[in-house]
């Protein structure tokens, strides 16, 4: 039974951290403030996570697991390459919209002043997303016999830049300008540029 409680406490700590990232933009989150929010001592936090960096890594693991599990599902279920790209971009933007605090980790804002390895891990996450899009576009040529108006690496990079821009706009607006706002219209413009 204690293992269940530990898992729940870990999840509670991560949820509190994500909540504080959402409600306290621009402010550094200390372990003292986090412990107060969770209702435990700082020592109790450290029983579950050896450092604040590990807490952020826990949230990054959540991001990676959520996004890539769903991306794999999209790739396995959807056969049309452009539809796959559309669904992947919408997934990323929808995830950001539903998790505003975690979105500050995605753009690196919440990681300022934290360990370099955290920012490197987020950079790697975006590289993996771009590689996934590039692979989907490459398969369009191979499986569907259809070409694109530009190299798939350029198109994949533009899609990631678009996604990154929408995430940053969401943060700049104080989480009021939703990343998925006008997505379908913007996707239609993307399709015209690339097909």
Swiss-Prot record:
Q: Could you tell me which InterPro entries the record lists for this protein? A: Homeodomain-like_sf, HTH-type_Tx_Regulator, HTH_TetR, NO_SlmA, SlmA-like_C
Per the record, what is one GO cellular component? bacterial nucleoid
The answer, when asked if Electron transport is one of the entry's keywords, is no
Where in or outside the cell it occurs: the entry states:
Cytoplasm, Nucleoid
> Is Cell cycle found in the keyword set?
yes
The record's listing under PROSITE patterns reads: HTH_TETR_2
Coiled-coil regions, chain positions = 109-141
Highest taxon above the source species: Bacteria
Q: Which SUPFAM superfamilies match?
A: Homeodomain-like
What are the TM regions of this chain, as residue ranges? none
Q: Which residues bind DNA?
A: 30-49
Example GO biological process: cell division
- HTH tetR-type domain location is 7-67
Record keywords, A-Z: Cell cycle, Cell division, Coiled coil, Cytoplasm, DNA-binding
Q: Which molecular-function annotation in GO is an example for this chain? A: sequence-specific DNA binding
Q: What is its main location?
A: cytoplasm
**Role, per record:** Required for nucleoid occlusion (NO) phenomenon, which prevents Z-ring formation and cell division over the nucleoid. Acts as a DNA-associated cell division inhibitor that binds simultaneously chromosomal DNA and FtsZ, and disrupts the assembly of FtsZ polymers. SlmA-DNA-binding sequences (SBS) are dispersed on non-Ter regions of the chromosome, preventing FtsZ polymerization at these regions.
Its quaternary organisation is: Homodimer. Interacts with FtsZ.
Entry's NCBIfam families? PRK09480.1
Provide the protein name: Nucleoid occlusion factor SlmA
Task: Identify the coding gene.
Answer: slmA
């Amino acid at each position: 039974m204690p293992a269940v409680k530990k898992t729940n406490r870990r999840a509670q700590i991560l949820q509190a951290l994500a909540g504080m990232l959402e409600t306290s933009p621009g402010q550094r989150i200390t372990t003292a403030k986090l412990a107060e929010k969770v209702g435990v001592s700082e020592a109790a936090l450290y029983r579950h996570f050896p450092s604040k960096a590990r807490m952020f890594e826990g949230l990054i693991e959540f991001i990676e697991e959520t996004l890539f599990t769903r991306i794999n599902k999209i790739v396995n279920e959807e056969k049309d390459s452009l539809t796959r790209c559309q669904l992947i971009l919408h997934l990323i933007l929808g995830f950001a919209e539903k998790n505003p605090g975690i979105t500050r980790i995605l753009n690196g804002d919440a990681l300022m002043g934290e360990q370099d390895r955290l920012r490197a891990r987020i950079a790697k996450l975006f590289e993996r997303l771009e590689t996934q899009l590039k692979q989907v576009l490459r398969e369009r040529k191979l499986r569907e016999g259809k070409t694109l108006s530009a190299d798939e690496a350029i198109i994949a990079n533009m899609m990631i830049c678009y996604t990154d821009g929408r995430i940053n706009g969401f943060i700049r607006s104080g989480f009021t300008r939703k990343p998925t706002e006008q997505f379908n219209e913007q996707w239609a413009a993307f399709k015209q540029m690339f097909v």
